[in-house]
């Protein structure tokens, strides 16, 4: 059973001591059938006055830290080791109610799935709906797997992965119009396309493991990653990564699930200080396979090297994902 260790370090810097408000930290991987957390640690400097753990409305693990000390830096380091048993491509049988689309959700499940079925963004001209419907067979019911797999691989082939300097997740129609975006943009685009078909879908945030022994052509490594979960009767929640064309959880480490990307921000908080006190942030993320002696020996060194690299690349996607969530209160 593969063991993976995730190192995630974030450092916020200020040009003078500032006070810190409450911070919500969502970095601990989720326990599940295919993923078991063996160990998890969280180091924060300056030391919090209090640190408590809760589960949010989606069952994600969230640490809430409060502070009574001023400092010029705020550092958060998470290290977790997980036993990862990836679920391969799912298989529906002809007897399953969701084998063909359209299908109907069970009336007992439907009320709980409504929040994941209702589109979140407008589609005034029907462009997003039209894009989604190109994966349907014109002459009858469509195998559901063909729709989901078609979208996953279609986005990867037709769209261009592009790191953006703007904060947040772009509108799905912008992703469609430009044919480009980040992993978060791709995930939200596919989620909305599925919702316009009446299929329940939600956002997943986590990490991507890139094996060193083969060339997968993955993008999105070295930072937090985003993909999609789809709910099907008889199958439950199933993973799809349109950025890398992955069906199932191979090389995907799940941290949080949410209806909206803003509910799955890794680190969210505020500081109280002058408007010009904030200097910038640095992020280093490293996912390694436990048991590879050479990799294990290099993991800490690689993390530090990556952190230094992100100092020079302050506007990259992972920096956006966390800096947007640090709501700076300026006085």
Task: Describe each PLM feature range.
Residues 1-180, 196-331:
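Mixed-charge, low-complexity segments
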Residues 192:
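Surface-exposed charge patches
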């Amino acid at each position: 059973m593969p063991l993976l260790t995730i190192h995630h370090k974030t450092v916020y810097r200020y040009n003078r001591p500032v006070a810190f408000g409450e911070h919500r930290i969502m970095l601990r991987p989720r326990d599940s059938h295919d993923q078991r957390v063996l160990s998890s640690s969280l180091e924060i400097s300056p030391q919090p006055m209090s640190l408590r753990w809760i589960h949010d409305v989606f069952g994600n693990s969230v640490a809430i830290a409060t502070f009574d000390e001023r400092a010029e830096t705020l550092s958060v380091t998470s290290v977790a080791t997980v036993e990862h048993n990836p679920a391969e491509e799912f298989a529906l049988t002809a007897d399953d109610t969701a084998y063909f689309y359209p299908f109907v959700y069970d009336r007992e499940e439907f009320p709980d799935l409504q929040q994941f079925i209702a589109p979140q963004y407008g589609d005034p001209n029907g462009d997003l709906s039209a894009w989604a419907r190109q994966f349907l067979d014109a002459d009858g019911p469509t195998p559901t797997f063909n729709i989901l797999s078609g979208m996953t691989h279609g986005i990867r082939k037709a769209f261009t992965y592009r790191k953006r300097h703007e904060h947040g997740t772009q509108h799905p129609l912008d992703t469609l119009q430009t044919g480009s975006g980040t992993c978060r943009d791709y995930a939200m685009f596919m989620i909305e396309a599925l919702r316009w078909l009446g299929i329940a879908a939600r956002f997943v945030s986590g990490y991507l493991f890139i094996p060193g022994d083969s060339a997968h052509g993955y993008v999105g490594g070295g930072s937090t990653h985003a993909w999609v979960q789809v709910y099907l009767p008889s199958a439950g929640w199933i993973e799809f990564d349109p950025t890398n064309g992955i069906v199932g959880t191979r090389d995907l480490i799940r941290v949080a699930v949410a209806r909206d990307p803003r509910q799955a921000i890794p680190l969210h908080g505020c500081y109280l200080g002058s408007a010009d006190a904030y200097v910038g942030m640095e992020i280093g993320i490293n996912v390694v396979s436990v048991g590879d002696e050479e990799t294990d020996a290099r993991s800490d060194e690689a993390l530090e090297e990556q952190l230094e690299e992100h100092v020079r690349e302050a506007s990259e996607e992972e920096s956006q994902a966390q800096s947007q969530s640090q709501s700076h209160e300026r006085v």
